[in-house]
Amino acid sequence: PYVTSSSTTAGGVSTGLGIGPKYIDKIIGISKAYTTRVGEGPFITELFDDNGKMLAERGNEFGATTGRPRRCGWLDLVALKKAIFTNSVTDLCITKLDVLDEMKKINVCIDYENDLPVYKEFEGWLSSTEGITEYDSLPENAKIYIKYIEDFVKSKASIISTGPSRDQTILR
């Protein structure tokens, strides 16, 4: 239940395209700076408070067909680390960093204890990252957040989006 019948792993790309895995030399894992979920099923970091509403509104997290708000929560680094390992991800792309710009505090899930998330809390940056294209121009707290993600999942964020347009992207 709660899954697709398609293979959503990097190995599924090889099968779907009809090419051998040795011809794939880079695997880019893509994750939002927070977590969302469409439909039913478990979502350990789901937020039911104003933070969840803010993520949905600022991130425009509404279904394209139904218009229903997507379920939003803090970034689950345990799940992301597992996905990166399972897919042999070589580079990480973090999207929607700008959605977190107005958050005073930002949490990430670093473990589970009795089916509950264990969080690490970060200070927000409370300034706009929208449109920034150079990593060094990011607010210091945003860089701390990204560095922690990279260290935890053991993958460099070589692409970071800071807005909805293609040109609002940091390439490292």
Predicted regions and their residues:
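Non-transmembrane, aqueous-exposed alpha-helical and coiled segments at domain scale
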Residues: 1-172
